[in-house]
Amino acid sequence: MTGRVRAFDERRGLGEVESGGEVYPFHCTRIADGSRSIPVGAAVTFEVAPGPQGRWEAVAISRV
């Protein structure tokens, strides 16, 4: 999938990716390059997977 980083809190390591009107939360450990940081507004590719609470989360996040 493709989308944009809508929000990212570096202190907590939590963010959101928006794609096609849907919003997918993610943790910084899901950023594929291992950097644990990504700027708000960055274009990304990602996959979705069920998270621990059963909602879909962004994983394998890479900048385009």
Role assignments for model-derived ranges:
Residues 11-16:
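Short aromatic-glycine-enriched beta-strand elements
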Residues 1-10:
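Structural detector for short beta-strands of small beta-barrel domains
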Residues 22-30:
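A short macromolecule-binding patch
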Residues 18-20:
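Short strand-coil-strand connectors
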Residues 49-64:
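OB-fold/S1-family single-stranded nucleic acid-binding modules
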Residues 5, 44, 48-50:
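Hydrophobic beta-strand positions in extracellular immunoglobulin-like domains
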Residues 32-45:
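Short nucleic-acid-contacting surface segments enriched for D/E, G, S/T with interspersed K/R
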